[in-house]
Amino acid sequence: MSDALIAPNASSSEAPQSPAEHYDPTRKQKSADKTARIPIKIVPAEKLKKPDWIRVKAATGNSRFYEIKDILRANNLVTVCEEASCPNIGECFGKGTATFMIMGDKCTRRCPFCDVGHGRPDPLDVNEPGNLARTIAQLKLNYVVITSVDRDDLRDGGAQHYVDCISQTRELSPATRIEVLVPDFRGRLDKALDILQACPPDVMNHNMETVPRLYKQARPGADYAHSLKLLQEFKRRNPNVPTKSGLMVGLGETDEEILEVMRDMRAHDIDMLTIGQYLAPSNHHLPVLRYVHPDTFKMFEEEAYKMGFTHAAVGAMVRSSYHADQQAHQAGFA
């Protein structure tokens, strides 16, 4: 998942379990607890000084930041903005926008770049689609992004829950455009896509995250070719629904590797692109190995349009869901 997935340097708010403490798979694991059990060893690197162009906008005193938080809590909803420690949370909440994270706050994967907690997920909340729909209507949102944790424990990967959320949101807010940022539905792709056919979103997003050489390190459990196939197959079934994907830079990839992934995306009929700077959530996550200069981001953007992407949001603080409404509007989809 992706937005999710690109977070600022910060310490986890949860205290780590000591090695002697009994392992509880139902407990949400963050930071060191989460990454300690993955097969890839995280090797500390010299901490790079954050450049001047990495700047986070804080919420202003007259913003809707606390109003949004109160509404979310009242409706028992989770946002990826909070769970993934997104650096843009102050700006987005302040403007009355949020990316909703469904199916709980415990992911079945342990991606070491991501700050979303890992653990044995709770049963699906049957009231969540209705709570989500009412919240979106209450906030009077014109454009929403719905994402989720990975749910490898579910036979359909959570596809039916996505459909329930989309359909109930459309019942209460028929004019609202809905973008989904889905997991990879590993091992159940055809079933998930069959289910999504019943109520497809307005924009279908699935993040590639990084270059294939770094998949084993950054996305254990995921497969580069599978992620491309997911988006291509969805597009084949829904030719009028735009597809979208995102990449983060700073994990050790080269510029040419990023360009090659962009070419692969276009070869698999992906319409929209986001590229942003990876920022490590903690010292227990993958380290930042480079800060990409704004000139390089500009080059990626120019190349994206040459390749035929309908829209490319590229920059240090760009995230998959950041200004997603503006991205879709500029691409002519919203």
From Swiss-Prot:
Pathway: Protein modification; protein lipoylation via endogenous pathway; protein N(6)-(lipoyl)lysine from octanoyl-[acyl-carrier-protein]: step 2/2. Keywords: 4Fe-4S, Cytoplasm, Iron, Iron-sulfur, Metal-binding, S-adenosyl-L-methionine, Transferase. Its cofactor is [4Fe-4S] cluster. It comes from the Bacteria. InterPro entries: Aldolase_TIM, Elp3/MiaA/NifB-like_rSAM, LIAS_N, Lipoyl_synth, rSAM. Belongs to the radical SAM superfamily. Lipoyl synthase family. This is Lipoyl synthase.
